[in-house]
């Protein structure tokens, strides 16, 4: 199975650097010089030549892609890795696609619903949960609200504020 670790953005300068939208928790290792990444759509493998951070944005150059014109053709290309080729992750490591279908429960074990998706790429990640009442609930994916993810046990533990999953008294019903 392939997993997207980044998306190539716009060129930066005239020497073949591109901005990269990072989608991995270890970019310094994943994009180290010499790292080989597959592309989607398939444009052949890309080998990282240089990597540096500039104002919070990762800038990469690739071997054989040496100027702005050449790198412009990579815009919006997804950089992917094959999960089967990856080293065994930590016991508590997970990938976003593994959350789909997990039970969403409170810290006391009360069922809240089922995880539908994890939206990434915005200001912060957002967990999409289909509540027990069928409504879709968006939960900011931050530790105070999502204290634990347990893929092996098939659950995501949530500590939602009052009213997020249960209607508050006085709210109109849909």
From Swiss-Prot:
A GO BP annotation: ribosomal small subunit biogenesis
One Gene Ontology CC term in the entry: ribosome
Coiled coil: none
Matching Pfam families: PRC_RimM, RimM
SUPFAM superfamilies with a match to the protein in the record: PRC-barrel domain, Translation proteins
Gene3D superfamilies the UniProt entry points to: PRC-barrel domain, RimM
InterPro entries reported in the protein's UniProt record: PRC_barrel-like_sf (IPR011033), PRC_RimM (IPR056792), RimM (IPR011961), RimM_N (IPR002676), RimM_N_sf (IPR036976), Transl_B-barrel_sf (IPR009000)
Domain of life, per lineage: Bacteria
Cellular compartment(s): Cytoplasm
Primary subcellular site in the record, as a coarse category: cytoplasm
GO MF entries: ribosome binding
Domain PRC barrel: 91-164
Keywords, in A-Z order: Chaperone, Cytoplasm, Ribosome biogenesis, rRNA processing
Transmembrane spans: none
Keyword rRNA processing listed: yes
Quaternary structure and interacting proteins, as annotated: Binds ribosomal protein uS19.
Notes concerning its domains: The PRC barrel domain binds ribosomal protein uS19.
UniProt record similarity statement: Belongs to the RimM family.
Its job: An accessory protein needed during the final step in the assembly of 30S ribosomal subunit, possibly for assembly of the head region. Essential for efficient processing of 16S rRNA. May be needed both before and after RbfA during the maturation of 16S rRNA. It has affinity for free ribosomal 30S subunits but not for 70S ribosomes.
Name of the protein: Ribosome maturation factor RimM
Lineage of the organism: Bacteria, Bacillati, Actinomycetota, Actinomycetes, Kineosporiales
């Amino acid at each position: 199975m392939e997993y997207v670790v980044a998306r190539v953005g716009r060129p930066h300068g005239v020497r073949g650097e591109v901005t990269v939208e990072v989608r991995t928790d270890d970019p310094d290792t994943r994009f180290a010089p010499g790292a080989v990444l597959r592309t989607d759509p398939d444009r052949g493998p890309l080998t990282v030549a240089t990597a540096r951070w500039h104002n919070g944005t990762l800038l990469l150059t690739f071997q054989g892609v040496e100027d702005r014109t050449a790198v412009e053709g990579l815009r919006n290309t997804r950089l992917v890795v094959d999960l089967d080729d990856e080293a065994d992750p930590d016991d508590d490591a997970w990938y976003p696609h593994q959350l789909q279908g997990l039970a969403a429960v409170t810290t006391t074990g009360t069922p809240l619903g089922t995880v539908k998706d994890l939206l990434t790429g915005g200001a912060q990640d957002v967990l999409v949960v289909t509540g027990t009442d069928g409504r879709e609930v968006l939960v900011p994916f931050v530790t105070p609200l999502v204290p634990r993810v347990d893929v092996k046990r098939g659950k995501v533990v949530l500590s939602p504020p009052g009213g997020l999953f249960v209607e508050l008294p006085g709210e109109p019903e849909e």
